[in-house]
Curated annotation (Swiss-Prot):
Organism ancestry: Bacteria, Pseudomonadati, Pseudomonadota, Alphaproteobacteria, Rickettsiales
Binding-site positions, S-adenosyl-L-methionine: G33, G34, Y35, D51, F78, D96, Q103
InterPro entries assigned: RsmH, SAM-dep_MeTrfase_MraW_recog, SAM-dependent_MTases_sf
Keyword Methyltransferase: yes
Recorded name of the encoding gene: rsmH
UniProt name for this protein: Ribosomal RNA small subunit methyltransferase H
Amino acid sequence: MSQYHIPVMLSEVLAVLAPKGYESYLDCTFGAGGYSNAILNSCYCSVTSLDRDPNVIESVEKIKQDYGERFNFIKTNFADSFRKLKHKKFDGIVMDLGVSSMQLDIADRGFSFLYDGPLDMRMSVQGFSAEEFVNTADEEEIADVIYKYGNESLSRRIAKSIVEYRKTARIDSTRKLAEIVRYSIGFRKGKIDSATKTFQAIRIYINNELEELEQFLANVKNILKKDGRLVVVSFHSLEDRIVKNFFKENSEKQVARSKYAKDEIKIDPNKWLKIITPKVLTPSSQEIRLNVRARSAKLRAAKKII
């Protein structure tokens, strides 16, 4: 069997998802194929995977060779996925949010300030790029994006520096943008680079990540079978808050009830989830040592009860 990338919190995802033979699963973020491969390898089930990144095709073909008709891939984003799935329902759904290691490690994709490359950041390699945004948006819009999506308290100072710099030269590389940010706010103490929040914010904005997540969750009930499980791995507080609130709003509060009570339990049809991770799960210290990118991961899961 071919070797596959090991995704974040794989053992925890499999334990919560609990794949069973002859059931069908949806991997919403294929990436390098780690979750899809692990689910298919765990039992004789089928997996449908989604991804908007055209660069995943090599990994897609590898899984097709290993698993044949048990695996199906659809090139799409969250917003268009329901139309392309054509009302198909699944026994379990897994979502690994944010940018993949594969995308971060390719300099030409422009996601990371660790590599000097074109300032792109588009997951689908189509549409508005990060370079276009930082060179055309006004100062207030840039500041708002960095503050809203990066939780960056010094967003206005960064935005001012970006606008001042582009008066003399175009900002067309990850190195240039990172240097502008570091120069404007200085180096911060600790392990996190000063440019981290700005890069995160622009990437989220360019790819419409939070809006697409909200749209997918609003419709996920229609493609999840009864007793099916939804497992979500997020990597920053904005994503995690959306998932946490969605689970809370759609789940019944558990109340202790006497076994002698004769009244029938009424189920609110709007409360269709049961949370199966009362406390958010995080990576083990061993996993973080092996993969520092796992340090911010959070896993939440729920089961459809009606």
